[in-house]
Amino acid sequence: MIPATGPLVSTEWLAAHLADPDMVVFDATIYLPTEAKDGAAEFVACHIPGARFFDIDEIADPDTELPHMVPASGRFARLMGDLGVSNSSFCVFYDQKGLFSASRGWWMMGLFGHDRAAVLDGGLPKWQMEARTVEAGDPPPVAPARFRPDFRASRLRGIGDMLENVDSEEALVLDARAGARFRAEAPEPRAGMRSGHIPGSANLPYNDLLATDQTMLPPDRLRARLAEAGIDGSRPVITSCGTGVTATILTLAMVRAGFAPGAVYDGSWTEWGSRPDTPLET
């Protein structure tokens, strides 16, 4: 069995464990509506050997108009089983940007009780920069497996929770969007949304936690950045972003820095900013 790791693994580590029987590698790429790319098509064109595609839009709740919301436990279990994931699998997630959406896959595994998961630090760009082997084409079929979820409700927040928190200020809300979006100085990439942020929230753009090569900063530097944003371990933390994807980069950083994972506001600004009845600040 592959030994437990931290929330991040290096390209060297993955290369050494790529052929292990319990290893499952996922490309969890998703692109913004303003980006003229398709994650699944790019995966077929180039991926780490043996990787499968983790479709964030498919492994989601089909009964809401909000993008890639967390599915019910039964749906998640079925889809992960179809992808060949069992409770003994070790899942490594990467994406085509470096570190953007891979953390969403890692976070979902933890949400459903599976801690044998990690993010590939630097993702596909670092793998390719090091001239490691890649392949193209559709992946071969995999044998179905049985995955038993153990849902951790404490790691997820809905809009009702967030409205209550505006009044109570019990939890610190960290917003991973760019500063200009947080301050309503730049439009949202999805049409029809107001600009601004949840009252009382703090801004920590996810890019501030990454080095220039899209690897995550070391724990000591993460702790410094998180402290500047108000994280000292005294209050619970809820992360948010545009659609609940880059919020999980903040979650990943907190775990890497030695803090509890906190919770993610799944609907994030796409839900909050599209409703006329939610308060906001600019």
Regions found by a protein language model. Give the residues of each.
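Cytosolic catalytic domains that perform sulfur/thiol-centered chemistry
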Residues: M1-T282
